[in-house]
């Protein structure tokens, strides 16, 4: 009986010891933390409207799939496009709602607000905007190599002054359990 207790206690101690994570606090690897810091750096470039350090966070041959006219290829083209973009608005602010990172991707749910300086996307100078988006960036060697933006269509339409379509009519009615009688 004592032998069995010793085996059980040893087994429990082994399980407890094996559950002890060797990762840094926060559960992220060093690579994931580096990727998240790079994403924070990119966000700071937009908030400050200063893209001189963008090359510290984005690869030379990076691709932004969220350009107004389609893919933006290369760091130099991104800097030019981003500079043009931020010139269209004032008092912009980015709020991070939630962020997730691993060794390959960083995903951030962000809220953007500001005031338009020029007429663009159906908005006039002085119009306020407030929108949210999911930003997804793929990283390699600590730099973003690809980026996508996902936005709620109804929120975009509202921001652009276009009313969203009415909700779809429920033609199916409530769901029924076909297995019960």
PLM feature spans:
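A solvent-exposed, acidic/Ser-Thr-rich amphipathic alpha-helical stretch
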Residues: 51-103
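Short, low-complexity N-terminal intrinsically disordered segments enriched in polar/charged residues
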Residues: 19-56, 60, 163-179
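Short beta-strand edge/turn micro-motifs at domain boundaries
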Residues: 130-160
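Bacterial N-terminal signal peptides
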Residues: 7-16
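Exposed beta-sheet edge and beta->alpha loop/turn motif
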Residues: 111-141
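Positively charged n-region of N-terminal signal peptides that target proteins for export
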Residues: 1-5
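Hydrophobic pocket/interface hotspot
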Residues: 39-42, 53-55, 62, 74, ...
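A mature extracytoplasmic/lumenal domain signature
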Residues: 100, 111-114, 151
């Amino acid at each position: 009986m004592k032998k069995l207790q010793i085996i059980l206690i040893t087994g429990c101690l082994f399980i407890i010891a094996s559950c002890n994570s060797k990762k840094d606090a926060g559960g992220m690897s060093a690579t994931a933390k580096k990727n998240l810091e790079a994403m924070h750096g990119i966000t700071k470039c937009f908030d400050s409207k200063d893209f001189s350090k963008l090359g510290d966070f984005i690869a030379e041959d990076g691709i932004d799939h969220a350009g107004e006219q389609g893919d933006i290829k290369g760091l130099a083209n991104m800097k030019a496009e981003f500079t043009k973009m931020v010139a269209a608005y004032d008092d912009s602010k980015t709020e991070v709602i939630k962020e997730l990172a691993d060794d390959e991707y960083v995903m951030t749910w962000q809220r953007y607000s500001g005031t338009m300086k020029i007429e663009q996307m159906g908005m006039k100078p002085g119009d306020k905007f407030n929108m949210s988006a999911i930003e997804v960036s793929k990283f390699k060697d600590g730099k973003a190599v690809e980026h996508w933006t996902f936005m709620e269509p109804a929120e975009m339409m509202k921001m652009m002054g276009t009313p969203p379509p009415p909700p779809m009519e429920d033609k199916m009615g409530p769901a029924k359990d076909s297995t019960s009688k």
